[in-house]
Amino acid sequence: MQMKILMCSVPDGSLSNTLKPLLPRGNHYQVPIQPVGILRLMTWIEKKGYSSDIYDINNLRPSDEELIENFKRTKPTVVGLSATLSHCYPNVKRISKILRKLFPNIWIVLGVI
């Protein structure tokens, strides 16, 4: 069975309210951050012969329904969650619960990239 690796950037959920508004995200604003660390890791993964994809949750800010739809469509076997700050924990927990409910045997890897 081929691994389907999905790399996800996790939103912090609290610092965005204190930053200068640049991009509207519902009732708050978020400065767009490019997931450079994730992209570098994906390059390494692909050099090792695996395929990977990215889901930029931090900048897209999808609803739970949109998360579920994306995860069902991509059907990952491994998900990497990049959480850059401790403020990300509530979203890490929320996303992990959604993944575990959809795919009980999925590997969820958490890192700071």
How would you describe each model-predicted region?
Residues 1-113:
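A short, structured N-terminal alpha-helical element that caps or precedes a catalytic domain
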